[in-house]
């Protein structure tokens, strides 16, 4: 699907500016940070299957993810957008999609690569976050966010109460699924104003995907080792996310003062088969070994509040928690090959407290200082300090509610 949609988006954005009813927009988002914390060689949330690799914290000023965004309104009927993320010398297509605007009756259809509409935070890029990093919930569920290569159909009801319903079908390339196994998502959002100063939005989302040999690093029980081996999970993954946001601004004007409360809760259930593989001759995982069934249930969430107490200045607090993962497997079979001390098998309740203060010179720049007490790794209390800047150059669309 990537071969079909992304070239189409790129071609659409390359149309001459003189074409009728086309208004191209270009923007560049620069992000940099200095972060100080414990030097942990390979970070992982204890008790949870790692969503990719997280390496040691860089203790110097670094250029973080840079975003290049190109968008265009293609007449009255459609819109195209391309988001490129540049980080550590690599370029990734985060989004590249075409969206219809003229289906009528509140319907829109989007095709290509896009951030899924599940939950609240998932559709937001890092520069739009209220904190310098993603919640533990997001990291455990998706790594950073969940993207689809596929189609999204959305309907906004023609009512006074905001009612949005959506369905997605994609190839499921992102964690917790794996390449080309397919994924489907459903979501519903409701919202309204309360008087002139308050507004709210609530949502419920469901994601279903499949994994084939989803990989993580483990240590085996080789007496001559231990060796690092690949743990492989093949099976189904189902995630339910509930979200709620409340905003306050005096008389609906957020320029002087405003307040935002935001929370999301999740439950993920997985079921399938576990295996391990190694090329070390003495490893019990040599050549690939089946370790039987694996069932798990995970829950958790986060809650945060951000208060703009005067123009340009904000403060915020966030609490993250993940409940101990409930797993069902045959210990005799699994631990004959894998070390039971592996962090993925631990019963532990990760949590983190974060406070931040930021100053915005204008809507195009922000400087943020954040402190966090991170206990997402068992036996490690990581006191983190982050100094971050975010700068936007060029036209940039308004952020969502």
Spans of features found by a protein language model:
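Sec-dependent signal peptide recognition
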Residues: 2-8
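N-terminal signal peptide c-region/cleavage motif recognized by signal peptidases
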Residues: 14-17
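Outer membrane beta-barrel
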Residues: 20-196, 299, 304-327
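Outer-membrane beta-barrel pore domains
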Residues: 54-55, 97, 122, 130, ...
